[in-house]
Amino acid sequence: MNDAELREAIVSAAYLEGDFLLRSGKRSRYYLDKFRFETRPDLLAALGERIAAAVREHEPEAVRLAAPVLGAVPLAAAASLAGGLPFVIVRDEAKGYGTANRLEGVNVEGELVCLVEDIVTSGGALMDSISAVREAGLVVRSAVCVIDREEGGADALARHAVRLRPLFRAGDLLQGEKTPAKPHG
């Protein structure tokens, strides 16, 4: 599947119109439902290959991927299979049972990891994961996402010394049809 076919398949599978409240608290007239492209084996495999290639190109020294729960986990698994890098899962919070870790999977202090994310809007979810990864002693300086909604997330991450590498930008993905999210309230 080439880039144009992948772009078309993502839009066809995931683009919804209506009135949606985003995680950032903003409202939007369109929504890109990540689960509609992450649960399709053909799209997940293609995205895993693209993410693995982006990591090799933009963070070649990374020894591990890191994926925030829930949406980024299938993407990191697909990229891990495609590129051979292991990954850790970043929980929203440590659980009070089992290992009680916020990061699940094997990791070694000082390792360089690359974050994987599905869709970035304001960057808030990724900034929380960056904090967790850094608190665990890992180094993070880049993130690869499937879609950047172009609503300030890349700038927010840059303020935390993390470069965002999107596979697609909303404006390109939707060919100029992007409707900016509006503040909630």
Language-model regions, residue ranges each:
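Active-site-facing substrate-recognition patch
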Residues: M1-H58
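Solvent-exposed alpha-helices and their adjacent loops that cap or buttress functional pockets
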Residues: S24, G105-E109, A136, A156-L157
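Phosphate/pyrophosphate-binding loops at sites that engage ATP/ADP/AMP, CoA/4′-phosphopantetheine
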Residues: I51-V63, I130, R134-A136
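Structural detector of well-ordered beta-strand residues that form the stable sheet scaffold
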Residues: L65-A66, V88, R141, R165
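PRPP-dependent phosphoribosyltransferase catalytic core
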Residues: N2-S12, S131-G185
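Short, glycine/charge-rich flexible loops or terminal/linker lids adjacent to PRPP-binding catalytic cores
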Residues: A76-C114, S122-M127, P180-A181
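Short glycine-rich phosphate-binding loop at a beta-alpha junction
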Residues: P60-V69, V144-C145
